[in-house]
Amino acid sequence: MQFPAGLRALNHADYRRFYVGQVVSQVGSWMQSVGQAWLVLQLTGSPLKLGLLGTLQFAPVLLFSVFTGALADRLPKRRVLLCTQISIAYLALILGVLVRFGHVEYWHVCVLALLLGCVNTVDMPTRQSFVADLVGKADIVNAVALNSAAFNTARIIGPVVAGLLIARFGVDMAFLLNALSFTVVIFALLRMRTEGAPRVERGRSMLADVGEGLRYALSVRRIRLLLMLLFVVSLTVFNFSVYVPLLARTVLRVDAAGFGFLMAAVGVGAVTGALTLGNLRQPQLALPLVLAAGFVACGGLIAMSAVTNFWVALAMLFVIGVSSIILVASCNTALQLAAPDALRGRVMSLYTLIFGGTFPFGSFMVGWISERASVSTAYLGAGISGVTALALITLWWRSVPE
C-alpha cells in the first residue's frame, strides 16, 4: 500500500510503527499535562506554584540538553528511546497511584515533574534525530510535519478526554491512562529494525562533541536566525500549561471539562498549521511566512489579555495554535536539513534546549505575574515582549550580510 504525497513518510515501515506509537503515547502525555495542572491548582490554588512546577519540569532541559544531544549521536537511538519511554510510563504510574489512594502532596508532583524533565532531556533530542534515520532526507519535511500533526492531534484529544475524565472520575485517571498509553510505543520500538546507529568518531570526549556541535550551529547564519526565532516564541507563547488553566479558573470560571476544550483549541489550530506544512515538498525557509506567524502568535497573546468570553477564547487559542506551530515546525525542519548526519543529534539538542529550556523562565514569569497582578497582565506582557523581540530580529537579519 502506497500512501499519498501528503503522508509519504508513512511508506517507511519503521517510521509508520513509530508514528502510531507516538500518537497514542502523546494523547496520554497531554492527558497528564492537563491533569497535572488541574491537580496543582486543586492542591494549592496558587498560580505561582503552578508556574514553579513548569520551571522544575523543564529546568533539566536547560541544564543538560546539549550533553544529551551528544549522547544521542553516540548511542543506538532505538535502545535509548526504549529506556526513556519505559521510565516516563513508570513516573506517570507512580503519580496516578499516589492520587488514587489520597496520598499525593504538592512536593510529590514537583519531584516527579523534575524526574520527568530529566528523562525528557534525553528523550527529546534522541527522538528528533531518530526521525531522519527512519525516513531519510528525502521525506524529512513530510515526517516532521506529520510528527507535528500527531503531537497536536494528541493536544486536541488528550485535553478533552482528560477534562471529561477528571470531571467524571477524578484526576488520577489522567495519569493512569497515560502510563498505559506508553505500552503501544514500547511495543512499536521492540518491533522496529532501524537502530539509529551512532555517528561520532570513537575515542573523542563528549565535551569535544558538544563543542563541535555548538561551533557548527553558531557559524551558520541561518541556524542562528532559526534559534533566535524559536527562542522568542518558546519563551513568550508556549506556556500553555500555565496560561490556559489560569485563564479557565480565574477569568472564564469554567470547570475541568471547559479547561480541556480550551487546551484542545490550541491543538486544533496546531494540527491545521502542521498539515499545511506537510504538503510542502521543498523545505525552503520562507522567512516572511515564519516571521508573520511569529507576529500573529505574539499578537494573539495581546488580544487574549482582553478576552472574557469562552467562545472568543477558543477562537483566539486556535489562531495562536496555527501560527505558533507554523513557526516551530518550520524551524525544526530547517534545522534537520541544515545539520550534517554526524551532527544532527547535537544540533537538534539546541532545538530542545531552546524549545524546552525557555519554559522554566516563561512558566515561572507567567505564574509570578498572574499571582501579583492577573493572568490577563501576563498575556499582555508576553505578547508585547514577543512582538518587540521579533521586530529586532527582523532588523538584525536585514542588516547582517550573508
Residue ranges and their predicted role:
Residues 1-8, 208, 396-402:
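Intrinsic disorder in cytosolic terminal tails and internal cytosolic loops
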Residues 2-59, 219-264:
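Helix-loop boundary and gating motifs at the non-cytosolic
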Residues 16-34, 56-72, 76-91, 108-166, ...:
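Substrate-agnostic recognition of the 12-TM MFS/MFS-like secondary transporter fold
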Residues 45, 100-104, 167, 171, ...:
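Transmembrane helix-loop junctions in multipass membrane proteins, especially transporters and channels
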Residues 62-67, 74, 80, 94, ...:
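C-terminal transmembrane bundle of multi-pass solute transporters/carriers
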Residues 129, 133, 175-205, 394-402:
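Helix-loop junctions on the cytosolic side of multi-pass membrane transporters
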